[in-house]
Amino acid sequence: GIYKNVELYGIRKRRIDNVHYIADNEGEVTFFTDVHFDFKRDDPISEDERLHYIVSSLPVGVQNAGKLESYQNLTGAKNFVNFHIPSPQLWYPVGYGQQPLYSYRVELLKGNQVVDSKEGRFAFRSVKLLQKPKGEAVLGYSLNINGEDIFVKGSNWVPIECFTGIVKKEKYKKLIDLAKKANINMLRIWGGGIYEDDYLYDYCDEQGIMIWQDFMFACADIPEEDVSFVEN
């Protein structure tokens, strides 16, 4: 059955569906904003509809951190904006460096009124999975973060309760803290489980723990002998 909150939203016109970003180690970051449109009716964009972006220029928690702002006219369902953060501080796994996180907020404006908003955090880091041939039958793998090879010390993460709806943030925090204390720097989210609560991913960001995310149904009984299924 349904085990999470059920919410009913009443909107007059538009809302922000999703915000995601791409950032590089030189401080360039692009935010992509998906805005909901009602395509069942004539729904033209008015001149006073804009997106207001607010981005921190220093990591969260740093005193006297400034902010960068940009107003962009709404262009449709897909929108984007570019920012440059001078001298960005890079995110590292625990044991290799700090975990600076920057903040952002996106507001959908109708005139001067905030119709909808979304906010979150982001980081600057590069990730490479390098494949290095070591022989005819052996292929070596190396995980590289910000140009530095990382020795991965990991563990599986399975649903922590049979009834997932009763799990509280405090239990996530306790188990992740124990993993960090055990010198673990990566958790593999098991493909036979669930997509975990956002809190798990956010707290791992803070603690420097990387996530290896399996696709769900990875351990399902897939009918590999069914030609039509495989070809689909």
Segments predicted by a language model, with ranges:
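Aromatic-lined substrate-binding rim segments of carbohydrate-active enzymes
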Residues: 177-179, 186-231
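Secreted/periplasmic carbohydrate-active enzymes, especially glycoside hydrolases
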Residues: 1-187, 195, 206
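Charged helix-capping and loop-helix junction motifs
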Residues: 170-171, 230-232
